[in-house]
Amino acid sequence: MKYTKIQLALILMPIALGALTIFLVPHLLSFMINDLKANHVYWYVRSEPLLVLMLVATVSLCYTLSQKLHLRKAITLVSAVFFGITALYFIGGEIKRLTPYVGQQGITWSYALKFMDPMVVFGVICGVVLLVIQVMISSPPTSKVKRAKKGIFGDASWMNLKEAAKIFPANGQIVVGERYRVDQDGVCNIPFAPGNKTTWGKGGTAPLLTFNLDFGSTHMIFFAGSGGYKTTSTVVPTCLTYPGPIVCLDPSTEIAPMVRFARKKMGNRNVIVLDPNSLLTKNFNVLDWLLDDSVPRTQREANIVGFSKLLLTDKKSENSSAEYFSTQAHNLLTALLAHVIFSDEYEDSERNLKTLRAILSQSETAVVNQLRMIQETTPSPFIREMVGIFTEMADQTFSGVYTTASKDTQWLSLSNYADLVCGNDFSSSDIANGKTDVFLNLPASILNSYPAIGRVIIGAFLNAMVTADGKYKKRVLFVLDEVDLLGYMNILEEARDRGRKYGTSLMLFYQSSGQLVNHFGEAGARSWFESCSFVSYAAIKDLQTAKDISERCGQMTVEVTGTNKSRGLSLGKSSYNVNYQQRALILPHEIIQEMRQDEQIILMQGQPPLRCGRAIYFRRKEMLAAANKNRFAPQAKKN
């Protein structure tokens, strides 16, 4: 741990205080013996070693008590060294005094040491006792509750770090955290400050906890509140270590600049950045996986139905008419998308979302006329049936459907975003080759307004892996930061349930469990918790999320002692009893108020909950050296 100059001065202060004590004690004794008799003076002078040793240890103890916990360990070490030197000085004087007598008349050292000055001996003993007390107050506080030996009401406990090392070895692929208990570290009582290295404790030096995608569904969910170091503690470290393909959603647009060159060095990888605000951005056709003629037509038609859902803003509404218009808008988009993909009137280069938007950009009358023409000329029964719904629809009803479909594809009128999903620089199937990474630099402000941009891109890559039908080189890791911005995506549930065999692993980041419930419902959220390999919680501020964590960590049995004192005539009588009570392993308020931001709780099936540190990249030298500078993260103070 590195300290500032002021903190170094505070740590070395026991040397100055001890030296001052050694200097003052003789003067104090001289002042006290001025008017004393000779026999009294003798004992005062004899007591000098005892006073010096005890006062040096006492002053150090009092000074240590006045300092913050994270400095006490270093102060205690300095105090122990200084006391040891002082004690050796007095012991050395006694040995020098006794040396001439050793060897005379058969006197041995074991016999001579019995005549050491008792003042020195007792001074050393008292000083050591005070040092032990100083060490105890310098250690992190132990648990406030006493666990019962019998688990009558439950026996929940935190996972042993040795067991954690077996499940999450240090040399794996996906960085999960650091193998140490933050709540048992010397800095546990002070807030984590990224710019102050003295608040880091063991963070940055402890062994890593990593996941090798070797158990469960290989999917992961991370919950961390706003400003909870989701990106710096998990996303960036994983991008620096994962050897397979990555598809990363980055609403903060900070990840790609930091890890791009590091990813390129990992086996000469092809790193693609989709950035609508950059002239150098790559682009691809999000419909290319639907244009594969080797896939049966019926399967392609079913895929079109699923993909068209991604174009709609799926917001839950209690208004039945709004739900109706949304459903019909989905049918309209499905019909027109199928027409664009299968119709002979379009060239292959025109089979994209721009063409779909061009149709919807027409007037309502023109769209209805085109739908009638499609119904009369298309050879596809699927398209004919889908279009037939709208050719006989009342004008006012169709107007509502048309407005909904047009509004949800409005973003395709923005040329930079339309070009992003309608190009040909690469194919969505390229991620299956094991050498391609894709970073989506889509600002959060745009995703808030037009979530469909991110949905269709991520949906295209997920569907491309399904279309590959198990023919992939390495598992593709979908790192979706702030996935709440995308809204409800049915395809994520499909990837969750069947993605393992298709080579896809999901790493989802939410700010609270409420966001997950908001999009998938209570039952859907439970399905996510049941299906993931593990769930991580950190920097939690939401009370409901804290309650959920507390319940999932389980209950333990604690001993509660009580003393009853009787009053009145039977004074002095008291009874002592021990009761067993149930207590949560960790209470909701402890999660919110006492857990530091660099601490997390990991829950997985069949294992105790794991409480450990977070691998914040700028605390680890090897990661800081590999990553480029983060323009958002505060820089550590330089000494």
From Swiss-Prot:
Gene3D superfamilies: P-loop containing nucleotide triphosphate hydrolases. It is a multi-pass membrane protein. The chain crosses the membrane at residues 8-28, 49-69, 75-95, 118-138. One of its GO terms (cellular component) is plasma membrane. It is found in: Cell membrane. The keyword Transit peptide does not apply. InterPro entries: P-loop_NTPase, T4SS-coupling_protein, Ti-typ_conjug_TS_TraG-like, TraG/VirD4. Pfam families: T4SS-DNA_transf. Coiled coil: none annotated. This is Type IV secretion system-coupling protein VirD4. Belongs to the VirD4/TraG family. Keywords: Cell membrane, Membrane, Transmembrane, Transmembrane helix, Transport, Virulence. Component of the type IV secretion system VirB/VirD4 which could be a major virulence determinant for subversion of human endothelial cell (HEC) function.
